[in-house]
Amino acid sequence: MANASGNMSAVRETMDVLLEISRLLNTGLDMETLSICVRLCEQGINPEALSSVIKELRRASDTLKASESTAS
């Protein structure tokens, strides 16, 4: 049981470090999104492809928000 607790602590510490790096790089990723990205990479998703998808989704979201604000 202590080993599982130590493992969870190490995972949490790793995620905290990754989140800090993410903030320093101004990625705009929150803990939940970063965690999803890490899990996808662990499952073999290409990190560069994942980055491209995130950028494209942000562009699409920005475009949608801009069109909604001009329509109202």
Curated annotation (Swiss-Prot):
Signal peptide stretch: none
Record-level GO BP terms: gamma-tubulin complex localization; microtubule nucleation by interphase microtubule organizing center; mitotic spindle assembly
Pfam family, one: MOZART1
Record keyword Transmembrane present: no
GO cellular component: centrosome; cytoplasm; gamma-tubulin ring complex; interphase microtubule organizing center; spindle
Keyword Cytoplasm included in the entry's annotation: yes
Keywords: Cytoplasm, Cytoskeleton
Annotated compartments: Cytoplasm, Cytoskeleton, Microtubule organizing center, Centrosome; Cytoplasm, Cytoskeleton, Spindle
PANTHER family membership: MITOTIC-SPINDLE ORGANIZING PROTEIN 1 (PTHR28520:SF2)
Family, as annotated: Belongs to the MOZART1 family.
Subunit structure: Part of the gamma-tubulin complex.
Function: Required for gamma-tubulin complex recruitment to the centrosome.
The protein, known as: Mitotic-spindle organizing protein 1
